[in-house]
């Protein structure tokens, strides 16, 4: 969202993830597990500023499978083409945060977004990870 045109933008989207491999790719990006990224907006020197509102306890696919085993969720009866995985993304251009209080304002914004996401999905138990990327 780094357009640098002076217009504040906020995007909230629910991204379907079709396969466990897609989930793994999202995890590698979200948790900064890769050695390099095609996204040129990522500044590796700032990764330590990223904030987890909920840190994953394992890899995303294993956590999902554990939720199934524990009865937290059920995929029984889903159609074969049903989408089992999703990613809820809140994206705001950096200029908005710079103009409204900087890093601390961004942390509070995303803390509030996390609370909203938990309500949207029916509770924190359905969220595998929630992270603010301050390095983008």
Regions found by a protein language model. Name each.
Residues 1-136:
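N-terminal nicking endonuclease/strand-transfer module with a His-rich metal-binding environment
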